[in-house]
């Protein structure tokens, strides 16, 4: 499943030869299975939040390149699509990428 996500979500930039990876959000992907996977993850997180009366979700990992940024962006988009208030904070002070994902 992870290899499937890597193939769908990571594509080489056509303009730059730097080898950087462009990340696509669920707003840009036409693959139904990928979008539904993130919506299922959103539903599971929202259910767990309602059971424990939690308002904060943290995604973390000890290794770089495991998909924390794109997963948090896509889960945030999926939650916002339900009408929930979402505040996504990029706490990676050295290599922040959320502004690149959302093109701001």
Q: What name fits each language-model region?
A:
Residues 9, 42-45, 102:
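Generic secondary-structure transition motif, activating predominantly at the C-termini of alpha-helices
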Residues 50-104:
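Walker A/P-loop NTP-binding active-site region of P-loop NTPases
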Residues 1-4, 28-36, 68-76:
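Short, mixed-charge, low-aromatic patches
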Residues 16-54, 58-60:
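C-terminal boundary of histidine-terminating zinc-finger modules
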């Amino acid at each position: 499943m992870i290899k499937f996500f890597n193939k769908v979500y990571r594509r080489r930039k056509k303009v730059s030869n730097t080898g950087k990876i462009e990340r696509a959000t669920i707003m840009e992907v036409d693959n139904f299975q990928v979008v539904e996977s993130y919506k299922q993850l959103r539903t599971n997180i929202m259910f767990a939040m309602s059971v424990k009366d939690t308002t904060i979700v943290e995604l973390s990992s000890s290794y770089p390149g495991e998909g924390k940024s794109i997963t948090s962006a896509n889960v945030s988009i999926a939650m916002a699509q339900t009408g929930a208030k979402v505040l996504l904070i990029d706490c990676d002070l050295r290599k922040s990428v959320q502004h690149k994902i959302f093109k701001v």
